[in-house]
């Protein structure tokens, strides 16, 4: 088992994402451990003690502070530990092109500026109106997701919220219908989420197994019930006239990117 240590002098999310992207190519043969706030030479010493007993490991570093980064690199050379400095080469090239000295400010992208507060507001919005019967948020939403149960509406809303986009989701349930307000808003911000019926059946069956649901809940994953829901969803989406996205075998990140491109959001 390879252990990839994601090391940073900030929260370490960037290093972790890069490390996880690499680890995902090796399935069960690699794991990622995040080590944030390595800000001093003493922190580097503590880090080296932490990993000294690791038989197979490497470091993915996004440390910005030059002396700390160089010290960590030197220690890794001494210990024969592979290290990848992710941001260093990028910053150096950017500095050359811009003919400007970098700020070397750890965590600069997480500063509490307007973008940060917009993201927090969007997250609070998504949680407030998640899968609820309170549709007052429809008019204030940037995105409205409409789809059957288990089409990733909630996680997609939260992902979009992390990008500062206010998203609300409306579940399609034949017995409940949809709010009239849905027909009163701009259909350009409405996205219908569709999915292959066979995949939806499999997803719902796994969910039932996970929570040991029986009796009436079995209908939730039955062929007849899902056919009924698909017919209802098709009718509603046609009536709305909104754009649709097939989420079958599609990662949430991919679906979010499609939505953001349609909205013209970077």
Curated annotation (Swiss-Prot):
List residues binding ADP: 147-154
Q: Which UniProt keywords apply?
A: Kinase, Nucleotide-binding, Serine/threonine-protein kinase, Transferase
Could you say which EC number(s) this protein's record lists?
A: 2.7.11.32, 2.7.4.27
Mind listing the GO molecular function terms for this protein?
ADP binding; ATP binding; phosphotransferase activity, phosphate group as acceptor; protein serine/threonine kinase activity
Q: Which InterPro entries does the UniProt entry name for this protein?
A: Kinase-pyrophosphorylase, PPDK_reg
Please state what class of enzyme this protein is.
transferase
Q: Which residues form the signal peptide?
A: none
Pfam families recorded for this chain? Kinase-PPPase (PF03618)
Q: What reaction gets catalysed by this protein?
A: N(tele)-phospho-L-histidyl/L-threonyl-[pyruvate, phosphate dikinase] + ADP = N(tele)-phospho-L-histidyl/O-phospho-L-threonyl-[pyruvate, phosphate dikinase] + AMP + H(+); N(tele)-phospho-L-histidyl/O-phospho-L-threonyl-[pyruvate, phosphate dikinase] + phosphate + H(+) = N(tele)-phospho-L-histidyl/L-threonyl-[pyruvate, phosphate dikinase] + diphosphate
The family annotation for this protein states: Belongs to the pyruvate, phosphate/water dikinase regulatory protein family. PDRP subfamily.
- Output the HAMAP family linked to this UniProt entry: PDRP
UniProt function note: Bifunctional serine/threonine kinase and phosphorylase involved in the regulation of the pyruvate, phosphate dikinase (PPDK) by catalyzing its phosphorylation/dephosphorylation.
Q: What's the protein here called?
A: Putative pyruvate, phosphate dikinase regulatory protein
Q: Which organism is it from?
A: Clostridium perfringens (strain 13 / Type A)
Q: What is the lineage of its organism?
A: Bacteria, Bacillati, Bacillota, Clostridia, Eubacteriales
């Amino acid at each position: 088992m390879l252990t990839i240590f994601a090391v940073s002098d900030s929260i370490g999310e960037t290093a972790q994402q890069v490390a996880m992207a690499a680890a995902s190519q090796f399935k069960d043969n690699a794991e990622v451990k995040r080590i944030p706030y390595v800000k001093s030479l003493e922190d580097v010493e503590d880090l080296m003690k932490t990993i000294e007993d690791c038989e197979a490991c490497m470091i993915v570093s996004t440390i910005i502070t030059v002396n700390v980064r160089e010290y960590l690199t030197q220690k890794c050379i001494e210990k024969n530990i592979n290290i990848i400095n992710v941001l260093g080469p990028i910053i150096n090239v950017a500095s050359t092109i811009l003919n400007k000295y970098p700020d070397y400010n750890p965590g600069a992208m997480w500063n509490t500026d307007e973008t940060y507060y917009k993201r927090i507001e969007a997250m609070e919005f998504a949680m407030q109106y998640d899968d609820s019967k309170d549709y007052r948020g429809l008019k204030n939403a940037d995105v409205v997701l409409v789809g059957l149960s288990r089409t990733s509406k909630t996680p997609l809303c939260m992902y979009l919220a992390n990008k500062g986009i206010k998203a609300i989701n409306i579940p399609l349930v034949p017995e409940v219908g949809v709010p009239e307000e849905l027909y009163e808003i701009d259909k350009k911000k409405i996205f219908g989420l569709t999915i292959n019926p066979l995949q939806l059946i499999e997803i719902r069956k796994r969910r039932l197994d996970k929570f040991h649901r029986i009796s009436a809940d079995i209908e939730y994953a039955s062929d007849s019930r899902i056919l009924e829901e698909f017919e209802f969803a098709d009718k509603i989406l046609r009536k709305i006239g909104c754009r649709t996205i097939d989420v079958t075998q599609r990662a949430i990140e991919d679906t979010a990117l499609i939505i953001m491109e349609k909205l013209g959001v970077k």
